[in-house]
């Protein structure tokens, strides 16, 4: 049985966590609960939520509060997602960088580092 999109990602229009790190970065955390499957609907929902986060960094309100701050978009999974989701996020790095943000992935509190696929 697959989980509902809202169970995996919460409200797609809401930023789960926005915090200031000790390193002087804006940390935006997107929390994914349970097993995140690789279906097209799930992939689209994840991209939509990520886009909401990234668009928020361009808002006047955000720019006024955090002018020139480095931004980290951290996608955190409570359990290992489908490989299709990891492949998708690998391909999203340049897109996230276009917004001036860095993409981090965490699975069960363990940071995942992408290696170049060649």
Q: Which residues are covered by each model-predicted region?
A:
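Intrinsically disordered, low-complexity boundary segments flanking structured domains
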Residues: 1, 15-17, 60-62, 92
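Short charge-dense sequence patches
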Residues: 1-9, 36-47
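Aromatic/basic-lined ligand-recognition segments
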Residues: 2-21, 106-110, 115-118
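Amphipathic, soluble alpha/beta structural segments
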Residues: 10-13, 21-26, 80-85
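Sterically constrained small-residue positions within well-ordered secondary structures
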Residues: 19-21, 64-66, 96
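Short glycine-rich, basic-tinged beta-strand/loop micro-motifs
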Residues: 24-36, 66-80
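Acidic, aromatic-enriched beta-alpha/helix-loop junctions
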Residues: 40-64
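Helix-rich interaction surfaces within compact, conserved domain-sized segments
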Residues: 71-72, 77-118
